[in-house]
Structures are given as C-alpha cells and as structure tokens.
Curated annotation (Swiss-Prot):
Organism: Erythrobacter litoralis (strain HTCC2594)
Alphabetically ordered keywords of this record: Cell inner membrane, Cell membrane, GTP-binding, Hydrolase, Membrane, Nucleotide-binding, Protein biosynthesis
PROSITE patterns: G_TR_1, G_TR_2
Gene assigned in the entry: lepA
Similarity remark: Belongs to the TRAFAC class translation factor GTPase superfamily. Classic translation factor GTPase family. LepA subfamily.
SUPFAM superfamilies assigned: EF-G C-terminal domain-like (SSF54980), P-loop containing nucleoside triphosphate hydrolases (SSF52540)
CDD domains: EF4_II (cd03699), EF4_III (cd16260), LepA (cd01890), lepA_C (cd03709)
InterPro entries: EF-4 (IPR006297), EFG_III/V (IPR035647), EFG_V-like (IPR000640), EFTu-like_2 (IPR004161), G_TR_CS (IPR031157), LepA_C_sf (IPR038363), LepA_CTD (IPR013842), LepA_IV (IPR035654)
Protein's UniProt name: Elongation factor 4
Catalytic activity: GTP + H2O = GDP + phosphate + H(+)
Length: 609
C-alpha cells in the first residue's frame, strides 16, 4: 500500500509532434520501467497508425517508481492522452484522473492551437501545470521566445519552465524532480465506500475488456463484486494490476492510484468512459460527476468497392467497435453502391482513422460517401400530421420540402493559428465557407509573428475538406482546433444529381442555398469527364426539388451506318439515318447508364480543384 503523499498522477499535454511520446519514453527509461532491450520508440502508442501519424488515439497509463533527490521513492502515474479535438471527451476523462499536467511545447514551433484547447481543459480541472520546453537542441530553437509566448498566450508563469531535449535525454531528471515538487498528491479515503472512475477501456483477445481505472475512495481487489453505476451492469473482478508499460498483476489498487481491472466482460459497450465503479454491497450513494454519452458528430456511408466484401466489412466494423465504443453504425443500402453501412464518428480525424484502420488492418477497399452532419429539422403541422422535430444525418431521409418549417445545423468555433503571410488566403477560405469572424490577434515576437483568428463556422462546411485546404494554402503551417457551439438556423437544401434523368442516391448532398449552384455545376462538370460516352446522349443535372440548377450533356458516340452504301440513291442513306435516329430515341428512353466506381470516388472528392 502506497502512502497517498508519495503518489503523483499527471498527464502530458502537447500539440501533435511536439515530442510528447518521446518524453514519455525517456521518463520510462530513467525510472527503469523497461530494460534497454525492450525499449522501442513511442512505447505507449500501440497501433501502427498511431506511430505513423505520430498521434495518440487511445489513452494509456504507466506506473513508474522514481527515487527523488530527497531519498524518498515516489509512485508516478503517467496518463498519455490523445491530443486531438475529436477525442476531447477521452482527454477530459483522463485529465479528471490526474492532479497535474506537463505542458510540452516545442522550442522551435511555439504554442499551437491544440495545445491551448487541452491546457484550458486542464486549468478547468484545477491542475498544477508544469511547463516543459522541449527540443532545445534544435538549431532553430528559441527557448526564451517560447517562454515569453507561454506567458503571453496561456498566462502561465514560465520563469521556472524545465528545458529539455527528450530525444537526446537532456533535462529528464529535472522534469521528474519538477513533477515531485510541484504536482500535488491525490486525496482519498481508504475506508470510504468504493468509488473508481472508468478512464478508458479496450478489448484484449485473451482477457476480454481491459478497463483503466482511477480509484478515488476505497480499494479495488480481486474477487470483488462491482457495479457500473451508469451502465447498471454487475461484474466480478478477476484481475487487478498496473502497466509499467508491461502488464503487472497487483493485489490491490488503493485510493489515488491508477491501474487496470478485467472482469470477463465481452463488449466495450458495457464499459463506458466516465462511468463510476462501486461495490454491489454498501456501494457509493451517487456516481462521480462529468459523465456524458458521447454523441457522433459526423456521418458517412461506407461501402465495399467489391460487393462480395460486404460480409468481411460487417465483421471488421464489428471488431473495431469492440475497441472503440465512440463510433456507431447501422446497415444501409444504396441503389448505386449496393450494401454498406452508415457510420457515425466523433469528428474528421476519427473518420479518417477508422477508414484507414479498415483498409490497413482488414485489407478492405472502401468507398466513402460525402460526410454529413446531424441536422435538426422542424416539420410544420399538416392536416394529417402534427408538427414535430426530427434529426437527420442521411440525405436519403430528407423530408418533403413543403413540410419543412425550419432547419438547424451545428456550428463550431474554430481557432486557427497561422504565420502572417498566409492570413489573407485563410480569411478568404473561411469567408467562402460562410464563416463569421469573431476575433483576430497577433502573438509571438518579430521572428515568430503569428495570427490567431477565431471564426464561427457551420460544421457542414468544415467536414468536407476544410482541413486539407487549410493545410495546403498555408503550406502546412496553420494549425486548427474547434469546439461545438450549438445549432443555428440555416437555409439548407437537398441537392440531387440526376444522370439520364435518374437520381443517383449516393451523390445527393445537403448544401446551403447560396453555394448550391456552384457545387452543382462543379459536380456535373466532373461527372461529365468521368462517365464514359454511350451510344446515346446523356444529360447530367443537379436539381433542388424540381428545379434544375446545373446541366452538362455527354455527347453520343455515333456509329457510321451509311458506310456500306456505295454510290446509289440518297434516299437509301436517309432511310438508314432515320432508322438510327429512332433507335437512339428508344435507347435514350430505356438505356442504362453505367457509372464507373472511379467516377463516384472522384465526384465525392469535390472541392480539391
């Protein structure tokens, strides 16, 4: 049993690529969590995709024992949290399990957008924040400049910021000493009824669901009968332990400590992040605060390129769901693309990661339809039906235009950091996406002058390709972060694409009336280049309701029917041409247009011109 005053729980906050995982590696090495042979780069990022993109997706924890300069041995629990906005709820749960945080800032790049979002969350949890300036051995490093930036932008006192270089191992001892000295120990009562917060969970093929917990009061031991207060299920604990990053079984997890439990649970669904665990007998009267159901924000259709892969896709999505309860899916069928799934995600990065994991880990080729968001549609009262409010995320379910009273769409508050040179292009991009500018300030010194601009933007304009466009016009220098700010009324319409007068369901979009014509024209032009010519003329149209707003025509291929006539009377040729004309008219009426798979994929990648 560890004395409470000797425990330190902390997380590491950093923007992507500022060296968070490398610093974690060094801390593990110095405290002897792994032998030199077992040490690998980015120990805590288990998935390949986490290592490749240099991002952390699932929260991980490590328990380290450190003997400080005062001769005492401290138990340090490091929570490695995701840094991306899509996983903000996971971050907030991980932060709630700690008392302090290391704020890691790259000495060459300074403070970025996502650092800020997570720092503010950390401050809300009343954390003690220890600034760490990393990568000080880079030639472009300006530690003093960054120190001033931390004080200006975040308002933290950075006079005692720890200077380190995680890669070359400079200053790691100083970081550990700062953790012991500055971060407060947790509070908790060993004899009170058990209260433990569920920080994260994942599926292990041998153990079932592994649950990461932070014990607030009481003690977790093997053989305890526990109840999940929000989920309402009961389980028998069959293993308790911690990670050093290796799995180590322990006799108990006491108050203030972070560890894991398993209870032969088969589905991650039952172990929801943020739930409270207590004993079945004499349990805690009420759960911990801060639990909420995670709602998907962005939706899109996932279809296999080869229809025969549908079963494989169903299986793979089921397996992914075991590990990631925050994404939801339901079956959907489309006339153009066959059977597939409609899936909901926490945000764009989440969508990309799931897509990439499906194609990489399960070897699937997928078509994804245009991402859409959740619209709240108020339907007017009619003779036969009452007025009601419905939520729609699939353009196929769009109600009759005449019944719609008001449509509300989700808006976000976006914070963009960019070097001054690219500001004009970025403001134009936000303007084109119906953004409303709310603030513009400058931060940093002469050599690192950057603009911080905040915009209110409709989420539906951001899900498409906003992030890619932002990165390309700023040559990768701009950083972007967003939070949701509720719904607002919008003049939205459903745009259908008709090929040979038949609507193609997979290409319908919900767009704002002001940009409908432009989008429709772009889509028609693109399809005109992609659909092969047939023996008859094919009209491609974009329509809102019954009104056609854009049209392109694919010219027919002409077979030379008069080639075999040699000399002779003109009426012979006329007869053949008339016959061809009639055949074409009949063909146009009954002919089927085949739209190649590539056309779908390319048409859905609009906005990249």
């Amino acid at each position: 049993m560890t004395d409470l005053s000797k425990i330190r729980n902390f997380s590491i906050i950093a923007h992507i690529d500022h060296g968070k995982s490398t610093l974690a590696d060094r801390l593990i090495q110095v405290c002897g969590g792994l032998t030199a042979r077992e040490m690998s780069e980015q120990v805590l990022d288990n998935m390949d995709i986490e290592k490749e993109r240099g991002i952390t997706i699932k929260a991980q924890t490590v328990r380290l024992n450190y003997t400080a300069s005062d001769g005492e041995t401290y138990e340090l629990n490091l929570m490695d949290t995701p840094g991306h906005v899509d996983f903000a709820y996971e971050v907030s749960r991980s932060l709630a399990a700690c008392e302090g945080a290391l704020l890691v800032v790259d000495a060459a790049q300074g403070v970025e957008a996502q650092t800020l979002a997570n720092v503010y969350q950390s401050i809300e949890h009343d954390h003690e924040i220890v600034p760490v300036i990393n990568k000080i051995d880079l030639p472009a490093a300006e530690p003093e400049q960054v120190r001033a930036e931390i004080e200006d932008i975040i308002g933290l006192d950075a006079s005692e910021a720890v200077m380190t270089s995680a890669k070359s191992g400079i200053g790691i001892e100083d970081v550990l000493e700062a953790i012991v000295a500055k971060i407060p120990p947790p509070e908790g009562d060993r004899d009170a009824p058990l209260k433990a917060s569920l920080v994260d969970s994942w599926y292990d093929p041998y153990l079932g669901v592994v649950i990461l917990v932070r014990v607030i009061d009481g003690v977790l031991t093997k053989g305890l009968n526990v109840r999940f207060m929000q989920g309402g299920t009961q389980h028998l604990i069959d293993r308790v332990g911690c990670f050093t990053p290796k799995r180590v079984d322990l006799p108990e997890i006491g108050p203030g400590e972070i560890g894991f439990i398993t209870a032969q649970i088969k589905e991650v669904e039952q172990a929801r992040v943020g739930d409270t665990i207590t004993t079945v007998k004499n349990g805690a009267p009420e759960p911990l605060k801060g639990y909420k159901e995670v709602q998907p924000v962005v939706f899109c259709g996932l279809f296999p390129v080869d229809a025969a892969d549908f079963e494989k896709l169903r299986e793979s999505i089921g397996k992914l769901r075991l590990n990631d309860a925050s994404f939801s899916y339901e079956m959907e069928s489309s006339a153009a693309l066959g059977f597939g799934f409609r899936a909901g995600f926490l945000g764009l990065l989440h969508l990309e990661i799931i897509q990439e994991r499906l194609s990489r880990e399960y070897d699937l080729d997928l078509i994804t339809t245009a991402p859409s968001v959740v619209y709240t549609v108020h339907l007017a009262h009619t003779k036969t039906e009452d007025a009601k409010v419905i939520e729609i995320h699939n353009p196929a379910d769009w109600p009759d235009v005449n019944r719609i009273d008001v449509i509300e769409e989700p808006w976000i508050k976006a914070t963009i950091y960019t070097p001054d040179d690219y500001l004009g292009a970025i403001l134009k991009l936000c303007q084109d996406r119906r953004g409303i500018q709310t603030n513009l300030t400058y931060v940093g010194g002469a050599s690192t002058l950057r603009a911080q601009v905040t915009y209110d933007l409709p989420l539906n304009e951001v899900v498409f390709d906003f992030y890619d466009r932002l990165k390309s016009i700023s040559r990768g220098y701009a950083s972007f972060d967003y939070e949701q700010i509720g719904s607002r009324e919008g003049d939205l319409v459903k745009m259908n694409i008709l090929v040979n007068n038949e609507p193609v369901d997979a290409l319908s979009l919900i767009v704002h009336r002001s940009v409908a014509e432009e989008r429709g024209r772009g889509m028609c032009e693109r399809l005109k280049d992609l659909i092969p010519r047939h023996l008859f003329k094919i009209p491609i149209q974009a329509a809102i309701g019954g009104k056609i707003i854009a049209r392109e025509t694919i010219a027919a291929l002409r077979k030379d029917v008069t080639a075999k006539c040699y000399g002779g009377d003109i009426s012979r040729k006329k007869k053949l041409l008339e016959k061809q004309k009639k055949g074409k008219a009949r063909m146009r009426e009954y002919g089927n247009v085949s739209i190649p798979q590539e056309a779908f994929i390319a048409a859905l990648r609009m906005g990249e011109e």
